[in-house]
Amino acid sequence: MASVLEELQKDLEEVKVLLEKSTRKRLRDTLTSEKSKIETELKNKMQQKSQKKPELDNEKPAAVVAPLTTGYTVKISNYGWDQSDKFVKIYITLTGVHQVPTENVQVHFTERSFDLLVKNLNGKNYSMIVNNLLKPISVESSSKKVKTDTVIILCRKKAENTRWDYLTQVEKECKEKEKPSYDTEADPSEGLMNVLKKIYEDGDDDMKRTINKAWVESREKQAREDTEF
């Protein structure tokens, strides 16, 4: 800016010298007009310079923002959960998570799911997606908390004072498939046979030999009891 002002000042001095030496009206009018333009421009430049200085004095150094590392994403599979009358609480342990910026810990809720994303924690991103929650939750009232080395996801139950036996519908279905099915109207011995049959089918060779031996001994004992009568 100083060089521009200097050039304008030199132009102005030169125009003044020419004006003093000029005698012809047309030339003097042209020089007078040019002199006015230069003076106006010089005045504006000086005002800009005086206004710019306080702005620079008040200007604070720009905050250095650490670049967001795009490292690979780790899928979170280990977590714990419990519940109260109003909330289902999911606990995820991530060492150092309390030290990352708040905006780096994001949770998106829907009525039957949540999606956790932790960005740039020790050079990695961490993701946890849980779909098909056992029961509906209130999206607006659900939230997250970041504690020392822990993220707590708070899913607000849509129906308060109801108990969740499982976190997801899929978990419920898997557990129920594992349970042996009993028919209350069927013969109790038939139910036992079904259980033994399942154990036999799923067991190894040693288990099968043990069941076969027990089965033979049971049949022999039953035969002896029948002959006694």
Swiss-Prot record:
Signal peptide: none
Pfam family, one: SGS
Main location per the UniProt record: nucleus
GO terms, molecular function: molecular adaptor activity; protein domain specific binding; protein homodimerization activity; S100 protein binding; tubulin binding; ubiquitin protein ligase binding
GO BP annotations, alphabetical order: cellular response to leukemia inhibitory factor
Location relative to the cell: Nucleus; Cytoplasm
Post-translational modification: Phosphorylated on serine residues. Phosphorylated upon induction by RA or at high calcium concentrations.
Modified residues (Phosphoserine): S3, S36
Stored PROSITE patterns: CS, SGS
Alphabetically ordered keywords of this record: Acetylation, Cytoplasm, Nucleus, Phosphoprotein, Ubl conjugation pathway
One GO term describing the cellular component: cytosol
Location of the CS domain: 74-168
N-acetylalanine found at: A2
Region called Interaction with SIAH1, residue ranges: 2-81
Tissues expressed in: Highly expressed in brain and EAT cells. Expressed at low level in heart, muscle, and at very low level in the liver, spleen, lung, kidney and stomach.
Interaction with SKP1: annotated segments: 74-229
Residues annotated with N6-acetyllysine modification: K10, K21, K86, K119
Location of region: Disordered: 38-60
Region (Interaction with S100A6): 155-229
Source organism superkingdom: Eukaryota
Sequence ranges assigned to domain SGS in this UniProt record: 169-229
Role according to the record: May be involved in calcium-dependent ubiquitination and subsequent proteasomal degradation of target proteins. Probably serves as a molecular bridge in ubiquitin E3 complexes. Participates in the ubiquitin-mediated degradation of beta-catenin (CTNNB1).
Subunit structure of this chain's protein: Monomer or homodimer. Component of some large E3 complex at least composed of UBE2D1, SIAH1, CACYBP/SIP, SKP1, APC and TBL1X. Interacts directly with SIAH1, SIAH2 and SKP1. Interacts with proteins of the S100 family S100A1, S100A6, S100B, S100P and S100A12 in a calcium-dependent manner.
The name this protein goes by in its record: Calcyclin-binding protein
